[in-house]
Amino acid sequence: MARITPIERYRNIGISAHIDAGKTTTSERILFYTGVSHKIGEVHDGAATMDWMEQEQERGITITSAATTAFWSGMSQQFQQHRINVIDTPGHVDFTIEVERSMRVLDGAVMVYCAVGGVQPQSETVWRQANKYQVPRIAFVNKMDRTGANFLRVVEQLKTRLGANAVPLQLPVGAEDNFKGVVDLIKMKAINWNEEDQGMTFTYDDIPADMLEACEEWRNNLVEAAAESSEELMEKYLGGEELTEEEIKGALRARVLANEIILVTCGSAFKNKGVQAMLDAVVEYLPSPVDIPAIKGINEDETEGERHASDDEPFAALAFKIATDPFVGNLTFFRVYSGVVNSGDTVVNSVRQKRERFGRIVQMHANKREEIKEVRAGDIAAAIGLKDVTTGDTLCDPNAPIILERMEFPDPVISVAVEPKTKADQEKMGLALGRLAQEDPSFRVHTDEESGETIISGMGELHLDIIVDRMKREFKVEANIGKPQVSYRETIRTRVNDVEGKHAKQSGGRGQYGHVVIDLYPLDPEGPGYEFVNEIKGGVIPGEYIPAVDKGIQEQLKSGPLAGYPVVDIGVRLHFGSYHDVDSSELAFKLAASIAFKAAFNKANPVLLEPIMKVEVETPPEYVGDVIGDLSRRRAMVNGQEANDFVVKINAEVPLSEMFGYATDLRSQTQGRASYSMEPLKYAEAPTSVAAAVIEARKK
């Protein structure tokens, strides 16, 4: 089957914004004007097409990135048909991992801002993520019909708060109740949308007389931004020659793609004004898959490889989201970077070295789905029924394996116990947690052997809050949550030799006898974590009992003598012992080994290790003193700070146990304007006072 839309006419874009900037309504209007949905969905009615989880409709917020395919040929049908894959991303700070996931598979983004609220804290976080992945973007200032709307104030905030080189492409005609439409600064015409047909048609009119002067000034600003794209245009512009519409648009496009400028449009999605012209800007200024650099990866032989956006290259795709669908089970959302795949084809998951068969492939339109037979470079689609794929895995041609930019998921560092409130919740909870763990590789579930409690572990407090919240809303499971627990570790600092362990019961009947002598020594933290060396000579312990000694020690490692935490970075040398022809058994040697291990561990200067987090705080300069003071109180080691005009980045290493409640404290110190990220860095010895308190608490 031939390609329907040439790849140059693809636009893979994200709609990204602070909560309540009207992002979902904007996405809805895109679907309406591109002809996908015939009744406009309103968030106010809980009927929006893009928000498809039940609780999203309840709360009017977006949690999962739904990917939708739409088509657009321009407001005046001036373009050939373009295919726009829209990824609606959450704007809530708690769902930043979702935003980050989708930023990886986008080519361009539309940043939606509220004309009243402007650039809010979460906008700054999303902006930094877009910078990280070098995503070209345009801005849409929404809610121009609201009281207090001020377009130019938001343009100014884009410059001062985000450091963006913001260049208006339009100016609003009127604002608040009098918002009529926009002036196209390239054409120098006012666009008025027809309210009778919900903005499906429009007219170009003359610019209102009282706006002419401002429009001239802003147009000069726009043309100058275009002229700066090349020396040739600059000479023409400085020589007083008029630049043509094509020259201006081509030059602006080049600068947007190079991430040098942000073009700003405006409107009111709710009032059906402006989204249409913003869609034209998506087509004219945002990149197609061929405008962005080839994606890099690692070939089978560990050399660096790459895949260009072409149907002729071998198939390579990145799975960026796993979602559970009530009707079909697992949906794996993936972005095709190169090649073609048909339903029925077998591909290889190069990260897990497993083959997968593409059964059914669907193109998602919010929560409706259309079955398709093939997908090609540039497409975003979902596969049903892939067995063993998680977020960040690469799916590729078995004859040309490549691993695209691997996503590493660190081990969880924080755990809480969850217990179902009722017997009915008990069964549902196991199922719910299993599903959620499958969707999110940074979340784990296990049962505590001693207490029988279900323990969930994740990357931080917020992470676990969301999981519990989703359990309640999606799976209707009510659960009680314990206090957060830090995952400590135990190890030793000095070597001890010739420590004996003897297990002997020989009073009548068949007895038990095992006897071992071991050395215990610390290992390098970068090493294997545990090693067992057998140096028994002359058969003083028969060979069949040696594995039992190893096993006896390994069982002790799960729960250390200090405070019952896992033991790491130790080596054991077994070099002497004795046995009894009749009474010795594997069990007896296992018990002897555990006795020897405990005795040796307690003599070897045991210490408690605590998880240290790498913390990066980004804050406006005026709060730096407060932020650093607070970090110091949390036993932080501040490694340095980098500043630009708008934000100071503070890097620190902080014990995880001191970071509980940090999100709330940081918010109150900085009026919500700072953000932070935290990831596990290493384990380090806990100070004596901290270790003593932890050990004491475990005894209770």
Curated annotation (Swiss-Prot):
Subcellular localization(s) per the UniProt record: Cytoplasm
Statement: the UniProt record of this protein carries the keyword GTP-binding: yes
Binding site for GTP: 17-24, 88-92, 142-145
Name of the protein in its database record: Elongation factor G
Species in which this protein is naturally found: Mannheimia succiniciproducens (strain KCTC 0769BP / MBEL55E)
Pfam families per the UniProt record, alphabetical: EFG_C, EFG_III, EFG_IV, GTP_EFTU, GTP_EFTU_D2
Extent of the signal sequence: none
Disulfide bonds: none
Gene3D superfamilies registered for this protein in UniProt: 3.30.230.10, 3.30.70.240, Elongation Factor G (Translational Gtpase), domain 3, P-loop containing nucleotide triphosphate hydrolases, Translation factors
